Every structure is written in C-alpha cells, then in structure tokens.
Amino acid sequence: MAKKPKNSPEKSKYSSDTSSSLYSQTWLASVVIIGLLVGYINYQHVYTLFENDKHFSHLADFEREMAYRTEMGLYYSYYKTIINAPSFLEGVQEITHDTVTEHGHEINTLNRFNLYPEVILAFLYRPFRAFAKSANWQIELCWQVNRGELRPVESCEGIGNPHYFYITGVFIVAGTVASSIFYLGVLVSDSIFGGFLSVLCFAFNHGEATRVQWTPPLRESFAFPFIIGHIAILTFVIKYKKSGHSMILLLTSMAVPALLFWQFTQFAFFTQICSIFLAFSLDLIPFSTAKTVIHSHIISFLIGFLLLFGNEMMITALYFPSILALGMIIYISPLLSNLKFRPAYVLFLAIIFASITLGLKIGLSKGLGIEDDAHIFDILRSKFTSFANFHTRLYTCSAEFDFIQYSTIEKLCGTLLIPLALISLVTFVFNFVKNTNLLWRNSEEIGENGEILYNVVQLCCSTVMAFLIMRLKLFMTPHLCIVAALFANSKLLGGDRISKTIRVSALVGVIAILFYRGIPNIRQQLNVKGEYSNPDQEMLFDWIQHNTKQDAVFAGTMPVMANVKLTTLRPIVNHPHYEHVGIRERTLKVYSMFSKKPIAEVHKIMKEMGVNYFVFQLMNCSNDERRPECVYRGMWDEEDPKNSGRTALCDLWILAANSKDNSRIAPFKIVYNANRNYIVLKI
C-alpha cells in the first residue's frame, strides 16, 4: 500500500482546524479570565472608596446604622430584622407581616420594597456564622475606639460582622459591572482591545457611572449589575443569532434578580423591549432569536410577579404591555413577508407596538384602579409644563431627580468619553446606512450588526433618561463606554483599507490620552478621606431609647424616620420609599407639620394617625430665596393656597424652641431640645 505524502491535504486541513480550535479556546479563556480580573479590581476599588469615605472599620455598629441615610437605613433594617429573629423563616414572616414600618397598617415589605437582596444575604449569613464557628475561624475582630469628647465605643471588623457581610455582598455584586462592560466591549468590537477600551472608559469615569461606593444598600446597587449582565447576554444572543431553552435560561437568570431587586428595573427593561423592537423591525434579529428573547421576558415577568406577591406596579407599568406588544409583532411578522417597502413595514409595526403598549397600560391602570406609578408621569409632566404638586416638588427639587447637570457633560467630555462614543456612533451609523437597504426588505435575509444597533438604541434611551433625571446617568455612562469600544472594531473603522499598524497606533494613542485625562479622576476618588460622625443624631436616638416606650409611634421627615426605625426599632408612620400611592398620601399628612394650617387641625391629623412623637429638625424650616418653591414653606403655599396668608407652623416651632414656652404650640409639647438640631414634639 502506498504511503500518503507527509504534507497531504488531509493532514494539513486537520492541523489547521486543530490550530484554529486551540486559538479559539485560548482566546475565549483569555476573555473570561480578564473579565473576572477586572471585576475583582472593581470590587476592591469600590470597597476602598467606601472605607475611605466613612472610615467604616472604626465605627460602632450603631454608627454604621446611622451612616445608612434615608432609604438605605430602611432596607438594612429588614436584613437586621431577619438575622436577629429566632430563625430565618420567623424573620421572613416578620417582614411579610410588618406592622412597624407604617403604623396602623400591616404590609408585606417583600411586595412593596424589593427586599430580596436582604433576604438572600440574611439567609447566607446564618449558616456562614455557624460554619465559621464550627471550623474555629476568626471572622470578626473587636476593639475599643476612643472618640475624643464622645464616649468610647466597641468596633468590630471582619466578614463575621453583619454590616461587613452585607456590604461585602453588595460590592461583590457591584464588581461584576466592570466584567459585563468588558465582555460587552469585546462583543461589539470583536476585539479584546475593545473590551479594554470600554472598561478603561468605565474606570476613568467611575464617579459618573455609579454611586455604589457611597450608597451600598440602594436597590440600584443590587439590580444594575444584573441589568448590565442581562444586556451582555442579550448582545451575545443577538450577535450569534442564538435561540433555544439554554438561551432562555441564561437570559432569565439575569432578568429575574434584576426585577426582584429594584422597582425601576421594569422601566429599564421597557427601553430594552423598544430597542429590540427596532432591531427586529429592521430585520436584524431572526425570528427564532426574537422568540427566545421575548419568551425569556415573559417567563422572567411571571416569576418576578409571583415572587413579589403580585406587585401591582408590575402589571400597570409599561414593561408588561410592551412584552405582549412585541410578542404579538414577532408572531405576526411572518404574515407580513410580502410587505417589501421597509418604511411602511416599520411604521405599521410601530403603530401596532405603540397602540398595544399604551392601550394596555392605560386600560390596566384605569380598570384595576392602580396609581402607584402615577407620580413618575407627574414628574415627567412637571419637567415640561408648569404643572407641580407637593409630591413632584419632593422629587424635582432634589438634584438627583433634576435634569442632568452641565458639569456631568463637561466631565465626560474632559475624559474623551463622549467624543469617543460620538465618533464610534457616527461611524457605525454611516456604515449601517451605507450597507443596509433602508427602502426595500428581503424577509429571508437577516442583516448584520444587530447587536451593535441594539446597543446604540439602548444608549439613546439611556441618554434620554439621564438627561431627564440625573440619577439615571448610571445607565447612560456605562453604555457610552460600551459604544466607545466600537472604535476598536476594525470592520467599522476602515476595514482592509486601513493597515493594521495605523489602526493599532490610533488605538494606542486614544488609550494614552484616556490615561492622561482619566488617571486624575481615579486619584481624586481615592483622595476622598472622611470619617462618619453624627453626635446630634446619636444623642437623639439615645434619648428615644431611654425615654420612650418600645411601642411609641414616631413621625417626621422621611430620611430621619428610616434611621429611627433601624436604630431604635420604634414604629413609624412614614418612610422614604415613596413609590406607593398610600405612603404618598400619608407623607402629605405628616408634612402638614410644616404647613400653615391651624395648629389644632394638624394636631388632629397626627392623633388620627396614632403618632406619639414628631421628630423635627430646624433646617426643615429654612428658606431658599433662589428656589422658594423647593422649601416646605413654599411647597405648602402651592399645595394649600387657602392657608397661605396664615402664620407658618415652622415659625411657631422655632419660637417655642427658642423661648422654651410650650404654651405657644399647645396642644403640642417640646420634650427634647438638647442640641438645637433635633427637636422632639409630643403629640
């Protein structure tokens, strides 16, 4: 038998295939490892920033509780409830039948406040402590801290401390944001360099991309990592036209936690549905892939709805109707294969999508009588018209709910993020228009770059959200980083017409400029040094714990009430979680203490709510000549014009505090006035 030549075609082909497969596996492993590494670096970075800002390691546990301001304290209080309960199940039972948060009402806080992060962390904390104890691990180290004029306190550090376990969980989840941005950069650029470019942009604009390092317990801290992770998986699915049960499972594994952890997730997913709709209507997503995506959203919604005990806001928000609208469009699209004129096709689908989404949204809200999300549309309405009420003022007078600040745009331009993203965006749009038949469609052909178009449209949606409400720049800035990675996409930037040397040189030059402009931002973040201390509030809480009954009911401004509940465990009537029509009505009644209503009328309101004590801060009655509508006096003149000519109750409280004469405010009585900051009125 004749021997085959050494360099036979079969052997060369086998060798080539093996080499290609090995290269592919090595490349994939490199991408995964680098992604995990940047995630770990991000975790360490946010942890360091948090410690630098608060000097958290040297605080006593009660000081750590006070450091969780406003709604952060409210969320942490439920974690504290579960870990201090006799058993995990009893703790969950306590928070699902809560009578402390809104005195006079029993509420299911899991349904109302998206508390699954606290439930999960509390569930993990108990067995972790037990296992560490059995293994003789030292997981907590305690010492006494001298606080100068204040009494010494015991401070405990280590993963065994409930606070450390909690914030470590937050920062581990938050660290994955950098990983997802790196993977997205690789996906849209077809290059590891694109991944590096996107994650460098994120690092150098970190202060404009997230606030987890300052406010760990907020819902966005837990949910956004899953939202951006979901976007990464969705981009992969669209890019490689994947479909089937495994992809549904992957997408659902990210979408469900995101929905459970943050009420705003459904609005973020609504923008995603809109972005997918546009890509699908331009024939950039195949039918099978579109079905996979919409099925994952339907399953995620149903699981989220059930685990949140039938959260009413999920039914009436735009997300649920948009899922049904896109699902219908996907399934009727084969019937429209003969409609070849693309503008007519897209317009027809857009009319169907908008009609079903808005029709169902309005119909469900009216039919079920649910107004929980009405304040969102009131806020948007107030931004473009003269409309305003007490509730919209509480939002829009806060900087984070105002329009995006010019300084933010200036910073993002200064680090070259916006210029780089704009160059990438314009280049993509130019190539897309050039290579896509926008007039006539061939339903049998699926276009390329659907994953890029999806992310570009998602960026546009995120930018609109950020410009309207500054707090939402956490969606815009990361997506600017993702789109900036297109600069490393060789197919978009010149292709074979530009030599590899020139492309690499341009990329290296851009990265060098990014380092030059971005490193000072990182240094500035790391140079933030602080130490949390609030002796006035500490004195107040000591007084409450030693001078009031355990079942004494408190009212006051929303931020303070969250900390009163967390630290003193006293029942409260109002709190900072404002996304429910009932609590908005309660808060309006409580804040009548800052109005110009007759004092007897306000006393009656407090009595009817069962309030025993009202916590008042002198700064609550301050004036602002620049924005008089943004102080409580101005808000109440707008809300209650018939009493605008009367003496403000604020003036009476201040006068009584200064003169120590309770007769001026009878039947109220000042029972605490120790530090000219906090005043407690007995009802």
Swiss-Prot record:
What the record says about disrupting the gene is:
Defects in the cell polarization of neuroblasts Q cells.
Question: What outcome follows a substitution of G185D?
Answer: In dpy-19(e1295); randomize the neuroblast QL and QR asymmetrical pattern of mab-5 expression. Abolishes C-mannosyltransferase activity in vitro
**Identification of the protein by name:** C-mannosyltransferase dpy-19
Expressed, tissue-wise, as follows: Expressed faintly in neuroblasts QL and QR, more strongly in the neighboring epidermal cells (dorsal hyp7 cells, ventral P cells and lateral V cells), and in dorsal and ventral body muscle cells.
| Mutation effect (L218F) | In allele mu78; randomize the neuroblast QL and QR asymmetrical pattern of mab-5 expression
Which family does the record assign? Belongs to the dpy-19 family.
Task: Give the organism's phylogenetic lineage.
Answer: Eukaryota, Metazoa, Ecdysozoa, Nematoda, Chromadorea
Alphabetical keyword list: Developmental protein, Differentiation, Endoplasmic reticulum, Glycosyltransferase, Membrane, Neurogenesis, Transferase, Transmembrane, Transmembrane helix
Recorded hits in InterPro entries, A to Z, give: Dpy-19/Dpy-19-like, Dpy19, Glyco_hydro/deAcase_b/a-brl
Q: Where in the cell is it found?
A: Endoplasmic reticulum membrane
Q: Which GO terms describe its biological process?
A: carbohydrate metabolic process; cell differentiation; nervous system development; protein C-linked glycosylation via 2'-alpha-mannosyl-L-tryptophan
Species name: Caenorhabditis elegans
Annotated SUPFAM superfamilies: Glycoside hydrolase/deacetylase (SSF88713)
Q: Where are the transmembrane segments?
A: 21-41, 167-187, 188-208, 220-240, 267-287, 298-318, 319-339, 344-364, 413-433, 467-487, 502-522
Q: Which superkingdom? A: Eukaryota
Q: Does the keyword Disulfide bond apply?
A: no
Q: What is its EC number?
A: 2.4.1.-
GO CC terms, sorted: cytoplasm; endoplasmic reticulum membrane; perinuclear region of cytoplasm
**Listed GO molecular functions?**
mannosyltransferase activity
Its record classes its membrane topology as:
Multi-pass membrane protein
